[in-house]
């Protein structure tokens, strides 16, 4: 704001007509702003609030007589219709024991006859079968695997633990100051219409200096951007080079069965190393396989199955369902089918354990753990360990899947945390016959002792008739065959072919090339998709298709068809060296689900340790699992996901490329999606990370800290309390509390470069701590949160913990522990509040607290209220934040934290609280000062409401505050959502800039706010802010603080943008804004 305008606002002339003349121009500007806002309301389909302009000068309202209109108009008063919804009842977010394990009632016995039959077929006995399997099968395949060529890995640099921000250059300053920015020389005309007039009397030299400074600043920023782009380009080139080397290494591997078929290697994915973490952090964290609590050696080999717990892993739908080929074995006319795996643990699973992980994996199956009896003679730990190594490591090559606890040194003997046993069962008359582990060993021994076809069999089949060849090879069709000479060692044999001239029989495997191995056309496809999307956006903006649209679309479809056919691959390999495993493709899905279930079980055992640390037991672990899930975490199979994909592709049921279930892809970006989400008209999906809980936990932690500081530091003003609270709730302190609770050992996040940086990891820990506090709040209320925060903060300092936990009563309550309502009948000041209590339906035990809430700062200190209401207002703000956050979290389960923050801001804003103050008539009960006091401003009314909430919290507790806020505040949310008043000016401007962006631009231009100048003394600062879009100034404004100035300049810029947009769109019949308005009208009519 200029000096001339400041003087105008401070020196009011006495003559009434002179006042009208001086404020006539301001009224015209204000009316113009209202007209611009009407355009915005029309765009948002809001009812018009404008009135007819005055006919004469006398009808212009004086500034003191006109009400200060809110940016989007006053919210309407509540009616009975607004209370048709019960705001005190919430949908459940947690449920007690919702995941209780199922116990099977099946009668399970050992299949004795099957064991005798398999021992005869394997030419062994029950006492020798383990040794025979180890020597004939396991050692044979291992010896053959050792002959594979040892090709060194491509060395990738480790991720850096240092900050990613580049150091500032000498002489350069990244911050925006008044000397760094100045007025643009080419937009002075725009400024006259959209902002306050500039000081035209400034010296010409100053203007020249400002322009020169701005040019230097722009040049410096351009140089910094170029240097950053160059660094990013060089780093990208290095990564691409390493990626190509890694792919070429796999393609040219001497033992690769085919250059285009990917295979598994320990610690290596399809595109490079799975772990690029620095050495200091390789020995910790879930992503490296370190589970909390797995620090004790376990040996159950000599316990004869004592203290073991048996669970059957049921996979639904059954992988062999509706499949012609499945894993089974016929013995004496009885068919034993492969049912899956049994998981044997050394401790019972927690009662409150979730049935499945919270994260979603890209498999079409789900698993369920069923507690089921197993005969003692069916299970042997050593047998299961051998079977695990053979099935998971040698056949399916899940080389990074380990069940042995990593906290224990390698030279210490210990059992795996979970024993895995294959299940072959035959059900008859509700009686289940189960193969013992030794029967399974005999089965694999009999199958893998010799090759699929001997040389004599090959010669015979080459000379046989085609029908005989088909019959003899059909029994091996869709079998998983193994040859550890190759990579991958196990493939699915889709069918067999022969070459009569060469006397060879071939295994035929239909494969799908990995994306990283595929055609060269992928970059072209990506480019065409991007180009096509830009053309579609241009059509939405202009209503006219690009002339090259059809050509680009046809080329894209053609390349996609070629790429789809190029990914199909037929592999022919001679049968020599291949052995039959006795398994069919249905086992692949069971293997993946078993790996996932093992991680889930071990993680829940770790949560037992976490519950012991915080001394709290959750009723439902879904909420704590979600709290410990970082936003970077997608899915976890307990092993690298590339290994799982390769195994399913090579060994699972064949699925034609392109026939996968196509998920519906919805456009989630854009202004219309945001409006639809806030209205609840777009379908939502569960948000599978902890950011929603972190949003709620932030309010929980703030209230806990505010509560303790308020009652501990009784003589500190609100400014000092706010400083202490900021220090306690900052990320650095919360990250320390998270480590004290061992959250760093429980947090699930992606195995990449995101959280390698120490500062970023501490930030994630702080957010996780807040999410955990929210989870405890939802599960058990506010009291356990207070206890756990206290222990995390001062658990190792008993003296400080005692001081923190010792909460004194409020001084007014200490004076009258039984209540002071008797004083209200003899004190006129207190008796006036009976009417307010009757109006609200709330009766205070200590009515002096209620009087203190209505005692403003200008009231002298007295024995009745013992001070003013500023401390209560500070406490009430935290109470209001928590209760509103809790309401939004429960009522909007599909809203992201950003959406809920917008709604909360609209509910707890000063404007809303001022309306609440007027609706409840709080101003009538303000204790008057002995001298004349001015009328309450908007901020004063808001402080009055917060002080009342603080007094209610101190006197009656959190539940009374919850009832008051939900009844008084929450019904207004419907109005904010329907009228879209949650969208403040800065957010609205950003959405407009995104909507008006150039489709050909790689990155959308965002509005940029710059500080043009700071004027005035320290106690009366005036900040001048300008907003720029694509380098051009849209508006500038001056206010008493930066936040107000940015909001004001955003409003002015919106008015200018809307007028420009509508005048431009007037020349176009099918404009983007008309489409948006039509869509909004359709949504409203629907």
Curated annotation (Swiss-Prot):
Residues 1-77, 158-233 are annotated as: Disordered. Residues 13-23, 159-168 have a biased composition (Basic residues). Residues 181-190 have a biased composition (Acidic residues). The keyword Repeat applies. Its EC number is 3.1.26.3. Residues 607-781, 833-957 form the RNase III domain. Mg(2+) 2 binds at residues 873, 943, 946. It holds the Pfam family Ribonucleas_3_3. It catalyses: Endonucleolytic cleavage to 5'-phosphomonoester. One of its GO terms (molecular function) is ribonuclease III activity. Each RNase III domain binds at least one Mg(2+) or Mn(2+) ion. Belongs to the ribonuclease III family. Executes the initial step of microRNA (miRNA) processing in the nucleus, that is the cleavage of pri-miRNA to release pre-miRNA. Involved in pre-rRNA processing. Cleaves double-strand RNA and does not cleave single-strand RNA. Involved in fertility. Required for the function or synthesis of the let-7 miRNA. This is Ribonuclease 3. It comes from Caenorhabditis elegans. The gene is drsh-1.
């Amino acid at each position: 704001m200029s000096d001339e305008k400041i003087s105008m606002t401070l020196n009011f002339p006495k003559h009434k007509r002179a006042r009208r003349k001086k404020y006539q121009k301001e009224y015209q500007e204000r009316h113009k702003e209202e007209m611009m806002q009407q355009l915005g309301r029309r765009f948002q389909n809001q009812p018009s609030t404008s009135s007819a302009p005055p006919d004469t000068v006398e009808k212009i309202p004086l500034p003191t007589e006109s009400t200060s209109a809110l940016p989007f108009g006053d919210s309407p008063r509540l009616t009975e219709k607004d209370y048709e919804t019960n705001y005190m009842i919430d949908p459940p977010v947690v449920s007690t024991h919702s995941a209780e394990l199922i116990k099977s009632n099946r009668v399970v016995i050992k299949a004795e006859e099957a064991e005798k039959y398999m021992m005869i077929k394997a030419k062994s006995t029950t006492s020798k079968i383990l040794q025979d399997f180890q020597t004939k099968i396991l050692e044979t395949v291992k010896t053959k695997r050792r002959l594979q060529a040892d090709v060194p890995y491509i060395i990738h640099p480790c991720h850096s633990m240092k900050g990613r921000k580049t150091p500032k250059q000498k002489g350069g300053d990244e911050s925006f100051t008044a000397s760094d920015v100045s007025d643009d020389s080419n937009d002075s005309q725009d400024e006259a219409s959209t902002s306050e007039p500039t000081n035209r009397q400034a010296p010409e030299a100053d203007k020249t200096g400002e322009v020169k400074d701005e040019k230097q600043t722009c040049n410096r920023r351009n140089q910094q951007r170029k240097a950053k782009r160059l660094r990013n380009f060089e780093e990208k080139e290095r990564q691409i080079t390493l990626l190509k080397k890694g792919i070429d290494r796999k393609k040219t591997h001497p033992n690769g069965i085919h250059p285009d078929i990917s295979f598994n290697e320990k610690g290596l994915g399809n595109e490079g190393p799975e772990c690029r973490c620095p050495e200091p952090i390789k020995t910790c964290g879930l992503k490296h396989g370190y589970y909390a609590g797995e620090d004790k050696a376990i040996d159950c080999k000599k316990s004869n199955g004592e203290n073991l717990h048996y669970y059957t892993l049921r996979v639904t739908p059954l992988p062999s369902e509706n499949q012609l080929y499945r894993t089974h074995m016929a013995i004496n006319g009885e068919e034993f089918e492969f049912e899956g795996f049994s998981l044997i643990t050394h401790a019972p699973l927690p009662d409150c354990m979730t049935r499945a992980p919270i994260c979603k994996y890209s498999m079409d199956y789900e698993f369920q753990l069923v507690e089921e009896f197993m005969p003692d003679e069916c299970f042997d730990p050593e047998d299961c360990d051998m079977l695990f190594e053979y099935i998971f490591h040698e056949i399916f090559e899940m080389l990074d899947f380990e069940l042995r606890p990593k906290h224990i040194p390698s030279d210490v003997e210990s059992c795996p945390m979970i024993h895995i046993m294959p299940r072959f069962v035959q059900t008859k008359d509700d009686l289940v016959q189960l193969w013992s582990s030794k029967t399974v060993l005999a089965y694999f021994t009999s199958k893998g002792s010799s090759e699929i076809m001997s040389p004599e069999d090959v010669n015979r089949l080459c000379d046989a008739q085609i029908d005989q060849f088909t019959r003899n090879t059909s029994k091996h069709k869709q079998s998983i065959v193994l040859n550890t000479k190759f990579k991958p060692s196990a493939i699915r044999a889709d069918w067999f072919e022969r070459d009569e001239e060469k006397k060879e029989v071939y295994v035929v495997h239909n494969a799908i090339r990995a994306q990283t191995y595929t055609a060269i056309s992928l970059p072209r496809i990506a480019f065409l998709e991007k180009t096509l999307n830009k053309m579609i956006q241009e059509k939405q903006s202009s209503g006219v298709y690009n002339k090259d649209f059809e050509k680009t679309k046809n080329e894209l479809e053609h390349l996609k068809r070629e790429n789809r056919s190029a990914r199909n691959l037929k592999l022919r390999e001679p049968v020599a060296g291949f052995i039959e495993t006795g398994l069919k493709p249905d086992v692949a899905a069971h293997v993946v689900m078993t790996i996932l279930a093992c991680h889930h079980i071990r993680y829940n055992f770790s949560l037992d340790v976490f519950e012991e640390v915080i001394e709290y037991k959750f009723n439902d672990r879904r909420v704590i699992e979600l709290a410990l899930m970082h936003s970077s975490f997608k899915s976890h199979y307990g092993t690298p996901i590339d290994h799982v994909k390769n195994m399913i592709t090579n060994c699972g049921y064949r699925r034609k490329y392109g026939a996968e279930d196509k998920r519906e892809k919805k456009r989630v970006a854009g202004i219309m999606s945001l409006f639809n989400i806030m209205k609840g008209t777009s379908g939502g999906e569960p948000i599978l990370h902890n950011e929603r809980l972190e949003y709620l936990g932030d309010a929980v932690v703030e209230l806990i800290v505010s509560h303790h500081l308020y009652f501990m530091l009784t003589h500190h003003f609100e400014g000092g309390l706010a400083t202490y609270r900021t220090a306690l709730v900052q990320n650095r302190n919360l990250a320390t509390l998270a480590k004290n609770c061992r959250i760093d050992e429980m947090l699930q996040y992606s195995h990449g470069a995101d959280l390698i940086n120490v500062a970023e990891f501490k930030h994630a820990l702080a957010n996780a701590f807040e999410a955990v506090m929210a989870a405890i709040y939802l599960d058990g209320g506010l009291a356990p949160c207070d206890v756990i925060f206290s222990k995390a903060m001062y658990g190792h300092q008993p003296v400080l913990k005692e001081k923190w936990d010792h909460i004194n009563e409020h001084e007014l309550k200490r004076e009258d522990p039984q209540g002071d309502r008797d004083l209200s009948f003899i004190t006129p000041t207190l008796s006036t509040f009976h009417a307010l209590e009757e109006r609200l339906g709330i009766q205070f035990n200590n009515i002096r607290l209620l009087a203190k809430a209505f005692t403003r700062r200008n009231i002298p200190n007295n024995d009745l209220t013992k001070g003013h209401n500023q401390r209560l207002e500070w406490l009430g703000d935290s109470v209001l934040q928590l209760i509103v956050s809790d309401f939004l979290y429960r009522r909007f389960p599909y809203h992201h934290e950003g959406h809920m923050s917008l709604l909360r801001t609209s509910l707890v804003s000063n404007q809303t609280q001022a309306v609440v103050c007027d609706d409840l008539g709080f101003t009538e009960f303000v204790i008057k000062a002995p001298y004349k006091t001015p009328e309450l401003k908007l901020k004063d009314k808001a402080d009055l409401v917060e002080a009342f909430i603080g007094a209610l919290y101190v006197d009656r507790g959190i539940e009374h505050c919850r009832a008051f806020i939900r009844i008084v505040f929450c019904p207004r949310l419907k109005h904010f959502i329907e009228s879209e008043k949650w969208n403040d000016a800065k957010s609205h401007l950003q959405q407009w800039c995104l909507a008006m962006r150039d489709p050909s631009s790689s990155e959308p231009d965002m509005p940029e706010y710059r500080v043009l100048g700071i004027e005035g003394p320290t106690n009366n600062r005036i900040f001048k802010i300008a907003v720029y879009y694509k380098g051009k100034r849209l508006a500038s404004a001056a206010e008493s603080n930066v936040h107000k100035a940015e909001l004001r300049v955003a409003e002015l810029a919106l008015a200018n943008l809307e007028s420009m947009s509508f005048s431009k769109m007037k020349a176009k019949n099918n404009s983007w804004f008309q489409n948006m308005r039509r869509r909004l009208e359709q949504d409203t009519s629907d």
